[in-house]
Amino acid sequence: MSQKSQFAYRSSKSIGLVNASENYASPPKFEAISEPARNACYSPNGKLFAYATATQVVINDTESGAKLTQLPAANTYELGFSPLGKYLSTWERPGKEADGTPKQNMKVWNTETGQLVFSFVQRNQTGWNLQYTCDESLAARLVTNEVHFYETGNMSKGPIAKLRVEGISDFALSPGQNHAVAVFIPEKKGAPASVRTYSIPNFNSPLSQKTFFKADKVQFKWNALGTSLLVLTQTEVDKSNKNYYGETNLYLLGITGQFDCRVDLDREGPIHDVCWNADSKEFGIVYGYMPAKTAIFDNRANVVSIIPPAPRNTLIFSPNSRYILLAGFGNLQGSIDIFDAANNMKKITTVEAANCTYCEFSPDSQFLLTAVTSPRLRVDNSIKIWHITGAPMFYEEFNELYQAFWRPRPLNPTLLQNALTSASLPSPPTPHASASKLAAKPSVKPAGAYRPPGARGQNSTFSYRREEIDVMSSGSANKHVNSSRQRVVPGATPVIDGNKKNNKKTKPAVKQVAQPTAEVSDEKKIRSLCKKLRAIDDLKSRLNNNEKLEATQVKKIESEGKVLAELKALGWTPDA
C-alpha cells in the first residue's frame, strides 16, 4: 500500500493519524493527544488535518504530522475546510455576549496565518458551514429568502451578490468550473415545489428549473463536473400509507436547461441511495422494497446495467470508477458486495461487516475502510481495512470510536485510465499483523430469544404466565384438567385448600417464582441509581469544561450524595 494512503480516527481518549503502510505508524512529527476531541476533519485536498478540543483548534500537516497552527476557538463543535484548504470554518453553540447581543458563533479562519477572517451568527447546526466554489473565489450562505455570496479574499466587506427567492429552504453550489447554484422552494398553499439553477452572478432568469409535487425536502447531488444535477425529493408522510418514511422521487436536470426528467423506476418502494460515478457519466440507484434492486443509469437517465435484487441499501462508486460497492447497513445484516464494472459487473467478493456504521473506498480504490462507531453503536467499536479482493489488511478495536475516515487525495487521470483498461485485479500487499485477528474472528452466533436483564442466568420468570395462557386457550372442553391446577400469583402466599396432592405441586412453584422477584426488584433499583450516577458524572465533567448548565442540571449534581446513600443501602459498592 502506498505511503500516501492515510486515515484518521477520533476516539473517546485520542486522535490519530495513521499511514496505511505495512507498519501502520503515525507520521513522524504527529503528537498524539490524550484529551477528548469534539470533531476532526481533513481538508478536501488532503494536505491539512484539523481537530477541535474544548480549548482550541489544532491544524496539522498530513505528510509530516507537524503542528502548523493553533486557533483560539474554544468550545468548537463543528469544523469544515474550504476546497483548497485555505480557510477553516468553526461552529460553536449559539449564545449571548455579556451585553445581551447574540454571539457570533460561526467563524472563518485563514489556515496559513491563523487569523480570524469573518464571523457571524449561525443558529442552526444543520447546514451550518459556508459553501465554496471549486476555486475558492466565492463563498455562499443561506439567510431568510436569500443566498448571500462573498468574495473569500474580502468577506468583511459583506455580500457582493444576493439571490433572492421567496420561500427558499435549501441550496447547493456546483463543484464545476462554471459557477452555478441550485435552489429548492418547497410546496406552499397548493403551489408545487420547484428546483432552479442559476449562473452566478446572473440571477435574472434560471438556467434550468423543474416543478413537482410531493416534496417537503430535497437532497442535491451534483456530478463532479457540475454539468448535471440529481434531485432526490422526499415527503414527511406517504399519503398512500405504503412507506413509513414518506415518499421519494428522483429528478435529473442538465445545467444548460436543455434536458430534465423524472427518473422512472420499475419497482414500488423507497429510494434507499443514489450517487454519481466519479467520471460524472453515470449514476446508480438502490430502490424498491426489500430485497432492493440496483440499476446504473447514464447521464440521460437510460438504464445501462442492472444488479440482481438483494437486501442492500447503500451504493458507493470507487474513486477510479471501476468498482461498485453495494451494502446493507442500518437494520440490515452488514454484508458488502463489490462488483467490477470493467468485467461486466462480475462480483469480486463479499465482505461481512456486521454493525458497520461507516464505509469508504481509499483514494486509490484498492482498499475499503469499515468502522463501527459511537454513539450509533457503543459495542464492538473498531476500524477494519480490507483489500478490494476481500483480504483483511488491518484491524483495531476501541472502547469508543467516534470517527474514522481516509485522507482525500486528487485522483491521477493516468491511474484512472489504467484501472478501467486493466482486466486483472491488483494483488493484496502484506497485511498488518492485526489482520490475523480479523481473519480468525468467530462468526456471530444467533442471539436467541430476548430475556430481560433481571431474568438472565436463571429460570424464566415468565413460565407461570405461559402456562396460564396454555391452560386458558384450552377452554371449557378441558375443565377436568383445569380443576386440578391452582392459579398462583408470583410472590404471594398460596391458598391452602387442604388437598395434599395439590399442596405438593403448588409449594415448589411458589418457591421458584417468589425468590427471584425480590432480587430482580433490587437489581432494577441499583441499575436505575447507577444510571443517575453516570449522568451526574457527565454533568460534572461538563461543568469542569466551563460549560453553562441549567438550574435543573445543577440540582441534579447536588443530589449525588443522596444517590450514593441509596446505593450503599442496597449493598452496592463502587467496584461492583
Swiss-Prot record:
What ranges does the record list as Polar residues composition bias? 475-486
Q: Where are the WD repeats?
A: 71-119, 266-307, 308-349, 351-396
| Chain residue ranges for the region called Disordered | 422-461, 475-505
What does the record give under GO molecular function? Answer: mRNA binding; ribosome binding; translation initiation factor activity; tRNA binding
Q: List the disulfide bonds.
A: none
Top-level taxon of the source organism: Eukaryota
**What is the residue range of the signal peptide feature?**
none
Matches recorded under Gene3D superfamilies? YVTN repeat-like/Quinoprotein amine dehydrogenase
Its cellular-component GO annotations read: cytosol; cytosolic small ribosomal subunit
Where in or outside the cell it occurs: the entry states: Cytoplasm
Does this UniProt record's set of keywords contain Nucleotidyltransferase?
Answer: no
Gene Ontology terms describing biological process: cytoplasmic translational initiation; regulation of translation
Q: Read off the Pfam families from this record.
A: eIF2A (PF08662)
What keywords appear on the UniProt entry?
Cytoplasm, Initiation factor, Protein biosynthesis, Repeat, Translation regulation, WD repeat
Q: Which PANTHER family does this UniProt record tie to the protein?
A: EUKARYOTIC TRANSLATION INITIATION FACTOR 2A
Q: What does this protein do?
A: Functions in the early steps of protein synthesis of a small number of specific mRNAs. Acts by directing the binding of methionyl-tRNAi to 40S ribosomal subunits. In contrast to the eIF-2 complex, it binds methionyl-tRNAi to 40S subunits in a codon-dependent manner, whereas the eIF-2 complex binds methionyl-tRNAi to 40S subunits in a GTP-dependent manner.
Q: Which family is this protein grouped under?
A: Belongs to the WD repeat EIF2A family.
* Protein name stated in the entry: Eukaryotic translation initiation factor 2A
